[in-house]
C-alpha cells in the first residue's frame, strides 16, 4: 500500500496545483432528490466567510449541500473545500449531525473537543459526532484542501453520544488495512484494497457515519453492481480514472473530484479499465428516520 499512498500524494499535489473552475451555486438551494454521479463540471461554488466563527474564506466546490438534502437522507452534504494560508474554521460544536474532514493536500492544525491539536496532512481523517467540537486552521504556506462530508441519523440518542467521547482524529499511521476480493456482493473482480479510519462492524447504532476508507482498485479490478438497502454509500475519486455505473445502468467516466452516491434502494458499481490505480474515498452513512418521518 506504500506505493499506492505515494501515488495518491502525487496525484493530490497535481490536482490542486492548477486552477479549478466550477459553476456558481444555484440561486436557491431547496430540498430535492440528489443524483448519483457528479463529475467535476457538475460541482458548484459556495464560499463562506468566517466559517464556524473563524477567519478568512472557506471555499467550497459542492456536489450538494445540506439545504438540498431530504429529511431522510443520511449524507446531507459533500464538498471539496479549500482554506487559504492564514484562514481557519473556528472551533464549533455539532449538536445533532456528524462532520468529517478528510485531508487531501496541504498542512493544517486540527483541534478536537478536548482541546488537543494535531498537525494534519494528506490522508489524515477527522470527525466530529453529536456533542463534539472541532476546528481546522491553515497555518502553512500552501492551500489546505479537504473533503467535508456531513451526515445525520435522526433517531440517534444525542445525550448518549455526547457522553461517549469517541475518537476524532485518525492519522494515516493509525489507519488499518482490510482488503476484499470480488467486492460488491461477490460480483466484482480482483481485489478492493482499503485503508480505514473505522469500519461499519465497529459502528454503533446511533452513529450516522459508519465507515470511512481510502480505497484502491488496480487495473481490471471492479466493485460489482449491488444495491444498498438502508444506507448511503459515496465514492469520491481522488486520483485515476474509472467507470461508474448507476442504478439505471448508465455508465459515466469519473476522474479526480468526481462524487458518486447510492442511497437506500439504489444500486451502483465502479471499475478500473486503466493502467493507473483508481483511488477513492468510500464513506458509508445511515439514517434511521424517527417513526412517521417523511421526505
Question: What is each stretch, according to the model?
Answer:
Residues 115-130, 249-264:
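Short acidic-glycine-tyrosine-enriched beta hairpin
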Residues 96-108, 230-243:
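Glycine- and acidic-residue-biased ligand/ion/polar-headgroup-sensing regions
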Residues 62-66, 79-94, 198-200, 213-228:
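Conserved short histidine dyad/triad with adjacent acidic residue
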Residues 87-89, 106-111, 221-223, 240-245:
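Short beta-strand segments in beta-sandwich/barrel cores
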Residues 9-17:
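Bacterial N-terminal signal peptides
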Residues 1-8:
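Bacterial N-terminal signal peptides that target proteins for export
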Residues 21-75, 122, 156-209, 224, ...:
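A short, N-terminal "cap"/entry segment at the start of jelly-roll beta-barrel domains
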Residues 130-156, 258, 264-290:
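Ligand-binding loop in jelly-roll beta-barrel domains
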Amino acid at each position: 500500500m506504500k506505493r499506492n499512498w505515494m501515488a495518491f500524494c502525487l496525484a493530490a499535489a497535481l490536482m490542486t496545483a492548477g486552477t479549478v473552475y466550477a459553476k456558481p451555486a444555484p440561486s436557491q438551494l431547496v430540498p430535492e432528490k440528489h443524483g448519483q454521479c457528479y463529475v467535476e463540471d457538475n460541482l458548484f461554488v459556495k464560499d463562506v466567510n468566517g466559517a464556524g466563527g473563524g477567519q478568512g474564506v472557506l471555499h467550497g466546490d459542492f456536489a450538494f449541500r445540506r439545504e438540498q438534502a431530504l429529511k431522510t437522507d443520511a449524507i446531507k452534504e459533500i464538498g471539496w473545500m479549500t482554506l487559504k494560508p492564514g484562514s481557519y474554521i473556528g472551533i464549533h460544536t455539532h449538536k445533532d449531525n456528524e462532520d468529517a474532514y478528510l485531508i487531501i493536500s496541504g498542512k493544517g492544525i486540527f483541534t478536537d473537543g478536548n482541546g488537543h491539536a494535531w498537525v494534519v496532512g494528506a490522508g489524515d481523517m477527522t470527525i466530529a459526532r453529536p456533542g463534539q467540537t472541532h476546528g481546522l486552521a491553515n497555518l502553512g504556506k500552501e492551500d489546505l484542501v479537504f473533503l467535508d462530508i456531513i451526515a445525520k441519523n435522526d433517531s440517534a440518542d444525542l445525550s448518549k453520544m455526547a457522553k461517549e467521547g469517541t475518537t476524532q482524529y485518525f492519522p494515516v499511521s493509525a489507519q488499518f488495512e482490510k482488503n476484499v476480493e470480488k467486492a460488491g456482493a461477490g460480483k466484482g473482480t480482483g481485489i478492493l484494497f482499503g485503508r480505514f479510519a473505522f469500519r461499519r462492524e465497529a459502528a454503533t447504532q446511533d452513529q450516522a457515519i459508519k465507515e470511512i476508507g481510502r480505497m484502491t482498485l488496480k487495473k481490471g479490478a471492479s466493485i460489482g453492481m449491488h444495491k444498498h438497502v438502508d444506507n448511503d454509500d459515496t465514492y469520491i475519486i481522488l486520483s485515476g480514472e474509472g467507470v461508474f455505473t448507476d442504478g439505471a445502468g448508465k455508465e459515466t467516466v469519473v476522474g479526480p473530484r468526481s462524487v458518486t452516491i447510492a442511497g437506500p434502494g439504489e444500486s451502483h458499481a465502479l471499475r478500473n479499465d486503466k493502467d493507473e490505480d483508481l483511488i477513492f474515498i468510500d464513506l458509508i452513512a445511515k439514517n434511521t428516520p424517527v417513526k412517521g418521518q417523511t421526505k
